Structures are given as structure tokens and as C-alpha cells.
UniProtKB/Swiss-Prot annotation:
Signal peptide: none annotated. A motif (Cx10C motif) lies at residues 21-32. PROSITE patterns: CHCH. Residues 18-64 form the CHCH domain. This is Mitochondrial protein PET191. PANTHER family: CYTOCHROME C OXIDASE ASSEMBLY FACTOR 5. The twin Cx9C motifs are involved in the recognition by the mitochondrial MIA40-ERV1 disulfide relay system and the subsequent transfer of disulfide bonds by dithiol/disulfide exchange reactions to the newly imported protein. Pfam families: Pet191_N. A motif (Cx9C motif) lies at residues 46-56. One of its GO terms (cellular component) is mitochondrial inner membrane. One of its GO terms (biological process) is mitochondrial cytochrome c oxidase assembly.
Amino acid sequence: MVASCKDQKKAVAICLQRSPCVMIERHNPQECLDNPELNKDLPELCIAQMKAFLDCKRGIVDMTKRFTGNAPLSTGKYDQQYENLCKGKFDPREEMEKLKLLNSQQKD
């Protein structure tokens, strides 16, 4: 994975882990993305972050960005949060509240 898309990838993973599809319905994140029935219920924040990640990946192969660069290198902003979610060190209710808060801020 190119370092410039690492933060976007982790942001998508964190958002999917917090989504009702994973937290409440107990599907895995891949099922939530692949299944159209589950995909339509994803929070707008997750969809926006997925779009940003795909744009970043597209920028890797875009020859016009080869000289100027795709994006800033990874900052490690989501590393600790990602590790906690992967290891199960989180409170599901708290994560759902965070997702609701982030989703409502994006709509404003």
C-alpha cells in the first residue's frame, strides 16, 4: 500500500467498524460494502471516506499526478484508533455515538 493512502484506508476501516451494519447486525465490513442491501444503509460519512480512499488509489496510477504527487504522506493519525478497533478494545455504544456525531457534523 502506498503511504499516501494509508490514512484514508484506516479511516474507512474505522468508519465501517462503527457502522450499524457491523456493530448491530454483526456483518463483516466486506459484506457491508459488497451487498447492495447492506450498502444502502451505510452512514454517509463512510461512503464519503470510501470515495476519498478510492480517489486516492486512482491517483496512484494517474500519470498526471506522478510528478506532483498524489497526496501528503501518511500521518499515522488513525493508527491507535485502528489498533483498538481491530483488537476489540472499544465500547460499542461509545463508537456508535461517535459515528452519529461525525455523521451529523458532516450534514451541517
